[in-house]
Amino acid sequence: MNRRNFIQNTVKAGLFTGISLLPAGNLLAKNSMTETQLTILHTNDTHSQIFPFENNSGPYAGMGGIESRKKIIEQIRGTGNPALLLDAGDFCDDSSIYDAYKGKVELEAMRLLGYDAFTLGEKDFLGGIDNLATQLKHTGMKPIVCNYDFTHTSLQNWYQPYTIIQKENLKIGVLGVLLPLHDKISISGIENLVYLDAVMQANKTAAILQQQHCDIIICLSHLGDRYADGRISDEVLAKNNQCIDVIIGGHTHQFFKQPRLYKNKSSSYTLVNQAGWGGIQMGQLDYVFTNTTNKKLIRTKNILLREKKNE
Amino acid sequence: MLYLTFSITTVSMIRSIFIILFYYSFCIQPLFAQAITQVHFQYHAVTAAQKDSTVQQWLQPYTDSLNHYLNSVIGFSLENVYKKKGGGPLGNFITAAMLQQALLQTATKIDAAFLHPAGIKGFLPQGNITIGTLYALLPYTNRLVVQQISGAILEEFVHRMAADGGWLSTGINYAIDVYGKAKNIRIQQQPILPNAVYHIVVSDYMANGGSNCSMLRSLPSIPLHTTLIETCKNYIQSFTNNHEPITVNKAAQFTNIYE
């Protein structure tokens, strides 16, 4: 989607919030309402990049690394507004650190940075299903996945279809979906991971979150942003859901400059954002919630992380 | 695409972006003719401070033992082993490692091993070979796949490689003519029979059709769950276990015909 389209769409979205504001008669009356700002920070496909990219890595040299990421997160948390930190899977990849520790370091890093929720990607299974379950349990990290049945594996009881996070007066519903793994990786016991239709499961799970009166419903997705052949993707899910507000995407390593906005099945909008890969980029979405109207997106920042150069 | 606006802190510098401030009219109810929606879309680079003591403290034990692992010596090379156009000694060495690994894991006869040239970076230096050497040499996360291929498709694949000036290979020999066409293709010293079935080992990247290897995509495949790094480590250690430096086949796998 190009910039013009996005603006047009945002105008439409703005119209909705505009309409709901109109009966209030006066926009200045906004001060009398209680307002809460929520910042959603997100990463995807960090691929075991604990350290910044090495100097010989071409365009990415010196970018990323969890120290830079921590600084950004701390700055945003320092503003006092509630902040949500999310990851859309593939935090592991074949690398020296993954070969040596099999995902323990990556998961501990996410715990250290204070991730609120995360889903899995196909690369997180590289060390085998049992290894993933062991590392998740050792680090106390539970992934969010609603379109897979892991009952017949060691991941059983160690994943949730959704989670509800309370931040101040906000109730945030988070669900997770991932792509069909079978043609992406080859690991033993993969037949025990039972794929369920992503759109169906996401709608079912989002409906539960809506019933629980969540102020915003966020879907962590490792489906990929969109494909030429029209197979299941963030775009497909965005157009075919009822009540998902935001899809935090991954897998296709797209450096979104700004989010994409899609009209969903309930003539409202679903926003899709993705933050490249390797921890080079972080996505930021700022929402304002008022007690009389709904949420309103006020700002999006997609941030490239560069390390300070030694001079 | 990047425009300047403002900065967050002293350590972070923002090159931004654009701010959109738009007004729109609402025709139906002229009384509230104007509503303002302000959305900032920003895309910017941030330079964050380099060190964080909490991260350093947590990471230190891991980096220490990781460095210890990366510096552990697994073998010895008598000379620098280089990659050349179409393979060279280094290409021969790594594809020989692939062939051996596939043989050990499948216990079937593997006829040839192939790797796309971009799979290797740099060279194998003379002296001690460490695990770290292999991570530098093989920066991509390739895993091995054994494939069943008919002589006809194999020939098509060899032509594809010849057009590129030859790829890294073991087990196959051919000549490349001035037009970049493969000639006199021989697998395991024998001419290729179009209807015969061969077993080859390639990287998963190639098996999935990468580097224009679309002819490999739909072949019957057995993934070996082994990375290229692990493969080379095992191969090098097989020399070390016999108290020998590595042996490298320096013979070219193909010849160029100039006429």
For each predicted feature, which ranges?
Chain A
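Acidic, metal/ion-coordinating pockets
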Residues: R3, I7-K308
